Amino acid sequence: MDDDIAALVVDNGSGMCKAGFAGDDAPRAVFPSIVGRPRHQGVMVGMGQKDSYVGDEAQSKRGILTLKYPIEHGIVTNWDDMEKIWHHTFYNELRVAPEEHPVLLTEAPLNPKANREKMTQIMFETFNTPAMYVAIQAVLSLYASGRTTGIVMDSGDGVTHTVPIYEGYALPHAILRLDLAGRDLTDYLMKILTERGYSFTTTAEREIVRDIKEKLCYVALDFEQEMATAASSSSLEKSYELPDGQVITIGNERFRCPEALFQPSFLGMESCGIHETTFNSIMKCDVDIRKDLYANTVLSGGTTMYPGIADRMQKEITALAPSTMKIKIIAPPERKYSVWIGGSILASLSTFQQMWISKQEYDESGPSIVHRKCF
């Protein structure tokens, strides 16, 4: 498809917004889902200071801004800021006129009905898009892996979901949500590094810790054994240079941080770990399809990028499932963007073209059309 008529695919995550053109194999723009407002009154008259900044610009000026995330736990909670993010996506990142392109948006599983309607309304009334569609994130990840049946464990920055999908349809009664994801792990790493005597407190310093997490953390296959190894030798230690030149060393924190995915009690949470949540989700499904779900367990989202996570999931789910069950964990290398990639695939299918909600249909039926056309 040509860029001039190609559909736009926008995956709005709690942490990052991924946007680009249908038919591409990767998003053109990936930027933080952040809106920042100045903390102090501007002193330089005529500097043309803005009253708000979005994405990378907000990130780079974080020292003088108060940063807000309009998407919490995968669900939009601040529509004015969300509109700013979409505006930034179309006009500054993709440099397109939204009134000339169909737009595919993604939503969290179990997104409230009112939210889908609000998204639809903003697209048609604020941005005047000719057509739009809202797709469930986990379903897109499954498409991106070349499947229509399986269970997706999608874990991003703000929320983790386990979503069983059969023949392309998500099974809502069996979807489970876990409010434990990347941001919680970053906060936990901040806490355990503080115990080491390093101080990280501000929102700006949190971004440094996020970088440490992404570069150095991994999931242990056997947590107790790894703890013993870390205690008896320095083989697991790695160093990291902070922006000010100070070098810090991190040891067992490297695997203690993501261990919280399997043992949420580390964060003082009573919920089940991601392995049990996946198992519970499968058990809520019809007995006849469980075999297909066990054999097609797909990992998706940035928080599944830790080295070692697939092997650990395999081990934990094997321990929970019936002993004869074949279990396969699929961890595609591009899983950080698999929701977006699935959207790109879907929006460029010829069979999908009749699925779009057109401006005409919206004008006739109003925002509730989204429940009839997008499922």
From Swiss-Prot:
The annotated consequence of Y69A reads: Decreased interaction with SETD3
What's the reported outcome of changing P70A?
A: In BRWS1; likely pathogenic
- Tell me where it resides: Cytoplasm, Cytoskeleton; Nucleus
Tell me the GO BP annotations in alphabetical order: adherens junction assembly; apical protein localization; axonogenesis; cell motility; cellular response to cytochalasin B; chromatin remodeling; cytoskeleton organization; establishment or maintenance of cell polarity
Q: What class of enzyme is it?
A: hydrolase
> N6-methyllysine occurs at which residues?
K84
| Consequence when changing M313R | In THC8; uncertain significance
- Is this entry keyworded Glycosyltransferase? no
How does this chain assemble? Answer: Polymerization of globular actin (G-actin) leads to a structural filament (F-actin) in the form of a two-stranded helix. Each actin can bind to 4 others. Identified in a IGF2BP1-dependent mRNP granule complex containing untranslated mRNAs. Component of the BAF complex, which includes at least actin (ACTB), ARID1A, ARID1B/BAF250, SMARCA2, SMARCA4/BRG1, ACTL6A/BAF53, ACTL6B/BAF53B, SMARCE1/BAF57 SMARCC1/BAF155, SMARCC2/BAF170, SMARCB1/SNF5/INI1, and one or more of SMARCD1/BAF60A, SMARCD2/BAF60B, or SMARCD3/BAF60C. In muscle cells, the BAF complex also contains DPF3.
- What is the protein named? Actin, cytoplasmic 1
The gene from which this protein is expressed is: ACTB
